[in-house]
Amino acid sequence: MLEGGEATGKSTQAARLAARLRDRGIEAVETFEPGGTSLGAQLRALLLHGDAPVDPTAEALMIAADRAQHVAEVVRPSLARGAWVVSDRFVPSSLAYQGVGRGLGVAEVEQLNALATAGVEPDLVIVLDVSPAVASARVPGVRDRLEEEDDAFHLAVHEAYRDLAQARGWSLVDASSGVADVADAVWSVVSEVLAP
C-alpha cells in the first residue's frame, strides 16, 4: 500500500514496485483508489472533477463506496488467488484526508471504512513523505478538486500521515529525492517483508 499526499509519487512508485515484484516471479496487481473499478471511475469523476460542491461527509461516503467496490471486485479476488496487491491509496488516505483534513475524526472515518473493507487490511503501508510545498510544485497545469485545496489543508493531511505512520507503525519514506532513489527506498522496506 503506497500512501501520501498529492504529488508524492504514489502512482510512479506503485508501478515500479509492481514491476520489481513481477521480476521476482510474484504476481502483482497494481491498482488505485479512487477509481480502480468501473463504478469507482464514475465516483472519482464526480468527486474530483464535478462542478457541485461536495460536503465532507458525502466525500467520505463516496470514497468508502468506491473502496467497497474496489475490495469486492479487485482486492479480495486478487488476494484469494495469492497475488500481491500494490495499491495507490487505501484506508489510510481516508484517515488523513477526511478524518483529519476534513475534520470528520479518524475514529469515525475508520469505522465507516471497516464496513467498506469487510476486514481487508494491508500487510504493509508505505507513506511517501514530501513537504506540501515541494509536492505542489510537482503538479503541472489543471488541478483536481483536492489538489486545489489551500495550503492549510495540505499541511494538515501531511502532518496526519506523519502522525498516523508513527502511531500505527507504517513505514515513512522520504520521497523528495529522485524517482530511482525513492524506488530503492520503497524496495528496501518491501524486501523486509519478502525475507524469510
What are these regions (language model features)?
Residues 31, 86, 124-126, 171-173:
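Hydrophobic/aromatic beta-strand patches that form the interior of the parallel beta-sheet core
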Residues 16-18, 133-196:
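NTP-dependent small-molecule kinase module
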Residues 13:
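Hydrophobic positions on the alpha1 helix immediately C-terminal to the Walker A/P-loop
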Residues 24-117:
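ATP-dependent small-molecule kinase phosphotransfer cores
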Residues 2:
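Hydrophobic anchor at the beta1->P-loop junction of P-loop NTPases
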Residues 89, 94-159:
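A glycine- and Lys/Arg-enriched "phosphate-lid" helix/loop adjacent to the NTP-binding pocket
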Residues 10:
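Conserved lysine of the Walker
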Residues 7:
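Walker A (P-loop) phosphate-binding loop of P-loop NTPases
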